[in-house]
From Swiss-Prot:
Coiled-coil parts of chain: none
Pfam families in the cross-refs: RRF
Protein name (database record): Ribosome-recycling factor
Membrane-spanning parts: none
Role: Responsible for the release of ribosomes from messenger RNA at the termination of protein biosynthesis. May increase the efficiency of translation by recycling ribosomes from one round of translation to another.
Entry GO CC: cytosol
InterPro entries: Ribosome_recyc_fac, Ribosome_recyc_fac_dom, RRF_sf
Length: 185
């Protein structure tokens, strides 16, 4: 019973961390990274489709992405989608492929992105804390129904707190790494 609650809480917290890691990966640093375009979509036969499902995205060098669409007619759609995204990128259409150079980030934009990293991280922390609250509520429910003793409940709540502290530390580590990447010139 208690172990199920602990495992469920830990798994849900890990999923929250994965979501946070995905959200942080979408924030542009000065380096080229294929995940940067993961949330950009194009109209592909009437369906909004991520670029990653309609083209190969490769890193040509530290500051340039190469995009090779699987169909020739998609180059212009992909170019338009990247231009209208909020990433501030200007792709170059080479006909059968695209090159996407990453402009250097200015200091003001870096600070905005660091604020965004902090807010995303705080949202991740709140999610983890909500999971802790739910798990503690489940433990209190078991105690109320006399299925566990007070000592077992206290130990379970301590275990949940340890898991929560560990997950929040991992979230902070992800944020610190992203901030370091952003501030590196």
């Amino acid at each position: 019973m208690i172990n199920d609650i602990l495992k469920d809480a830990e798994n849900r917290m890990k999923k929250s961390l994965e979501v946070l890691a995905d959200d942080l990966a979408k924030i542009r640093t000065g380096r080229a990274h294929p995940d940067l375009l993961a949330h950009v979509t194009i109209d592909y036969y009437g369906v909004e489709t991520p670029i990653t499902q309609a083209a190969n995205i490769t890193v040509l060098d530290a500051r340039t992405l190469g995009i090779t669409p699987w169909e020739k007619g998609l180059s212009s759609k992909i170019e338009k989608a990247i231009l209208t995204s909020d990433l501030g990128l200007n792709p170059t259409n080479l006909g059968d492929s695209l090159r996407v150079p990453m402009p250097a980030l200015n200091e003001e934009r870096r600070k905005e992105l660091v604020k965004l990293v902090k807010s995303e991280t705080e949202a991740g922390r709140v999610s983890i804390r909500n999971i802790r609250r739910d798990a503690n509520g489940d433990i209190k429910e078991l105690l109320k129904e006399k299925e566990i003793t007070e000592d077992q409940a206290k130990k379970a709540e301590d275990d949940i707190q340890k898991i929560t502290d560990k997950m929040i530390a991992q979230a902070d580590a992800l944020a610190a790494k992203k901030e370091q990447d952003l501030m590196a010139v």
